[in-house]
Structures are given as C-alpha cells and as structure tokens.
Design a protein with these regions (language model features):
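Aromatic/hydrophobic pocket-lining residues that form π-stacking "cages" and hydrophobic walls in ligand
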Residues: 50, 124, 204
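Conserved beta-strand scaffold positions in the cores of enzyme catalytic domains, especially
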Residues: 34-36, 61-63, 151, 157, ...
C-alpha cells in the first residue's frame, strides 16, 4: 500500500494533505521539539550527529531521514535505532484510516492521494509522539517550502551548503533553490547556517529577517573576525587521528578543543559544527 503510492520526487506544492491527516490524529507533531534540516550536501550526516549530541545530553530522540539503504525502517529512528518491524507496522495501522479519509477527500476534489513520502512523514511524526521522544531531528526530503516535513513548527532550523539540485522541481538558479530551502524557517526560530555562496546566503538572510529568526552562521574564511557581521561558527583546527580526526570548534556558546570526531574528511568536521550548534540551540 505505501510503496504503491506516488514516488517521493513528485512534489505537489501543498501541505494540505499532510496537515489534514495530522489534524485528524490530534497533531502529534506538536508534542515534542523539532530540529528541521535542509540543504544540498550533508543533511543526513548532520542529522545523525545532531541526534547523537541530543541523546548524549539525556534526551529521548527521533530521527526522520531519507533515502534508506537496506530497509525502509531506517528512515524512522527512535533513540538512534531504526524503528522495529512491529513498530513500523503499528505506525502504519495507526495512521492508515486517516490517510484513507484524506485520500478520498483529495481525490473527490480532483487532487492526488498522499504520496509515498507524505505517508512516511506522517508515520514518523505519529511514531515519535507515541514513543514518546523529547526531540525529533527531521530531514527534508526535497527542497523545504513544500516538503511534507514542513508541517512542523520547528524552533531550530539547519541549512547545510546549498548547490544546484533537483532543478526540475526547485528552480534553475541558486537563488531559487535557496528560496525554497529557506522556506523551513519559522517565526522566532534559531537558524544554523553553513557557509554558503553569496546568492544563497542573501536569500537565507532575507527569510530569517522576515521571520525574526536568530541566525548563527558559519564564518566565511575571508571574513574579518572582528566584524559584528561575522559568523560565529567556525572549525578552528583539524588534526588527523586514529579512526577519525581531532577538531576544535567555535560556536556562539563556547570553544570546544580537540573534540574527537570518528569520521574522516573536512566536510564532516563542518557537518559536526552545524550539529553542535543545533544541539546548543535546543538546549538553550
């Protein structure tokens, strides 16, 4: 039933179907905090690290990511582990009657059924409430503004580096793509922003200002660090280590010296910086 639905890359510019199902379920997505992650590169790695940091702080966590590698259950994680087969079936059985109601209503009005990705998003949001989690880390499937996950009222948004991707659906320019991805920014939220090309940075800044959001931005290596406009997030140092790297991070809250990151690659250090800043924002 789930796999027979429209594939996740078929984006309909509407959140109405997902919102309608969640409303019938009693809005489970409002019972826990959320970190919403978009961008072009590094979303899943950043999501996983954010979840690990939040769990290390004593929080019960959920994570929704895509695509999956071996089993569809990987997309919905509870306390760092894929949801069990029993849990996955229970989540589907919980939402199925309401999905059917909204499908029928939508088709009667000439619209589509919920897509594969929309159903999985609803299942995840319901499963997180049922578990229950304290915080869920939610990765956007495609874009942001019209992504099924954008029904959440996240108080922390993370935007990883933006490049050209899914141009058929998001637009042919970096400005257009950034506009769609910045659509996850909510009123009064905190936005963690990776170093971006100028066109993307300008679009994100405009969205943040319009939503009165607090921006914690990764510093451009060419920026004057004494400038009040300079980003506050920075990878200060990296050293190779057995099984990974030692990284010194600077955030709005502190400098973390020689933190061991069990992953290789400079890009993973920058993903970890975003995750650290997101976890700080959740913990306040």
């Amino acid at each position: 039933e789930i796999l027979a639905r429209a594939p996740e890359h078929q984006v309909q510019p509407s959140l109405e179907r997902v919102e309608a199902v969640l409303d019938l379920l009693g809005n489970p997505e409002r019972t826990y905090r959320t970190v919403h992650i978009t961008g072009t590169n590094g979303k899943t790695s950043t999501a996983r690290m954010t979840e690990r940091l939040l769990a290390a702080g004593g929080m019960r966590t959920g994570r929704f990511t895509s695509p999956h590698l071996a089993t569809i259950r990987e997309r919905i994680s509870l306390d760092g582990e894929p949801i069990s087969e029993e849990g996955f079936i229970a989540a589907w059985e919980d939402v199925a009657p309401y999905v059917a109601m909204v499908d029928e209503r939508s088709q009667a009005a000439g619209g589509p059924r919920l897509s594969f990705f929309e159903v999985l998003a609803v299942m995840a949001l319901a499963a997180f409430a049922d578990y229950p989690v304290d915080v869920a880390v939610i990765e956007v499937g495609l874009g942001g503004r019209w992504d099924a996950t954008n029904v959440i009222g996240s108080d922390v948004a993370v935007i990883t580096p933006i490049g050209r991707d899914h141009e058929r659906w998001l637009g042919s320019s970096i400005t257009e793509i950034a506009h769609e991805k910045a659509g996850i920014i909510k009123d009064g939220s905190t936005v963690i922003v990776a170093h971006q090309v100028p066109e993307a940075a300008a679009e994100i800044e405009q969205a943040a200002v319009s939503h009165r959001a607090v921006v914690r931005r990764e510093r451009d290596p060419q920026e004057d660090p004494t400038s009040p406009e300079a980003g506050v997030l920075q990878v200060l140092d990296r050293q190779l280590a057995v099984g990974g790297q030692l990284v010194t991070f600077a955030t709005a809250a502190a400098v973390y010296e020689d933190a061991f990151l069990p992953l290789h690659g400079e890009y993973q250090a920058h993903n970890a910086l975003l995750a650290l800043a997101a976890a700080e924002a959740v913990h306040g």
